[in-house]
A protein has these predicted regions:
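Structured core elements
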Residues: 2, 14, 37, 47-49, ...
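A conserved regulatory-domain signal marking ACT and ACT-like small-molecule sensing domains
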Residues: 66-180
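Short, glycine-/Ser/Thr-/acidic-enriched flexible segments
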Residues: 18-21, 41-45, 52-55, 108-110, ...
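ATP-dependent carboxylate/acyl-activation modules
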Residues: 25-83, 87-100
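Conserved active-site and cofactor/substrate-binding residues in soluble primary-metabolism enzymes
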Residues: 10, 30-33, 53, 57-64, ...
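Generic secondary-structure boundary/loop-capping signal
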Residues: 12, 17, 35, 45, ...
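Substrate-binding/catalytic subdomain of NAD(P)-dependent oxidoreductase enzymes
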Residues: 1-28, 33
Length: 180
């Protein structure tokens, strides 16, 4: 999912896997369809939805655009800008960007492992919204966690802490989409 958001007076942009709740309009996008979900003060929430293109039509369109732009530059007919308004905006820092996260781990299935996780999260002031444990391979358990909203900086500290733990494997850490 590609996401761009204004955070305070900064902007955050990202592209990557995101868990989308079944209740979110983006969860209805299926197969080769694409969607753009926009939230704005004047329009509220809107979604533009339609068929996407396969790899060959997309490549053909991109190549055609590149050829047209190159040709226009060489001929000196690039035209005038529609709008030359500009406003400098800086990227948000990891301390400013907040999201809930889904974290999946494999841990030794023994006493004290859940306590270690709780201490790690407590040390970075992050909290669990949902946590489940299921059996994995012999002697190990799979822990699935959904956190309350926390910063990217907190997530990085959690990931660093997990790397220090013997026999703990981080399988995934994905944003969870909560708006919509």
């Amino acid at each position: 999912l590609g996401v761009a958001e204004k955070v305070n007076d900064h902007i955050t942009v990202s592209v990557g896997p995101v868990l989308v709740p079944q209740t979110h309009p983006l969860a209805t996008v299926i197969n080769e369809n694409n969607a753009v979900f926009v939230t704005g003060v004047a329009v509220g929430e809107t979604m533009f939805y339609g068929p996407g293109a396969g790899e060959l039509p997309t490549a053909n369109s991109v190549l055609s655009d590149i050829i047209s732009v190159t040709k226009n530059i060489v001929m000196g007919i690039t035209g005038n800008s529609f709008n030359d308004y500009s406003h400098e905006i800086k990227l948000a820092t990891p301390d400013e960007v907040k999201n809930p996260y889904y974290i999946s781990l494999i841990v030794p299935d023994k006493t004290g492992e859940m306590l270690k996780l709780t201490e790690l999260f407590t040390n970075v002031e992050a909290s669990f919204k949902l946590i489940t444990q299921t059996e994995a391979n012999e002697g190990f358990a799979k822990i699935s966690i959904v956190t309350h909203a926390m910063t990217e900086a907190q997530l990085l500290k959690i990931e660093e802490g997990l790397k220090q733990e013997k026999d703990v494997e981080l399988l995934a850490a994905y944003k969870v989409l909560e708006k919509g």
